[in-house]
Amino acid sequence: MVEAAVAEGWDVCVIATTAAEAGGFVDVPALEAASGRSVRSGWRRVGEEKRNPPPDAVIVASLTMNSVNKWAAGIADTYALGLLAEAVGLGLPVVALPFWSTALDAHPATRRSVRVLRDLGVRVLYGPGAWEPHAPGTGGEQVDGYPWGLALRAMGEASGGVGRRCVSHDPTT
């Protein structure tokens, strides 16, 4: 998705969770090469300069069940979730592309959280015609077919196709 976004003229800033980095769920060197920027996963230190420009729009992919529930509840205990809470408060276009199983989807908090985020103006690409949960234990088989392009198209529609974007790559929080 990062390469496709850059090809469309986006200035892409990748934000990963520390759990995603530690678990090997993101290929940091590949993302840095594709975006031309350092992947960020933590708050900057006091006195440290900002490394990324402010975003004009945000894509959250892949959004986990844990993160959708934290985000909807206003929990900002990671750098990525803090940026997402702020993006909603700033009224930025935000597109979220989930990734979780039907077992996790069956929990009432998950659907409630999707509704909360939609009520806040987040375009959650969830349900028929968008992304749908996979069978438990088959997540690894779904990775190659994950619809990254769906998120990029939705962002183009939501933002008018111009600006900067921070992509939150959040598969493990």
What is each residue range found by the language model?
Residues 1-173:
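A cross-family phosphate/adenosyl-ligand binding-site feature
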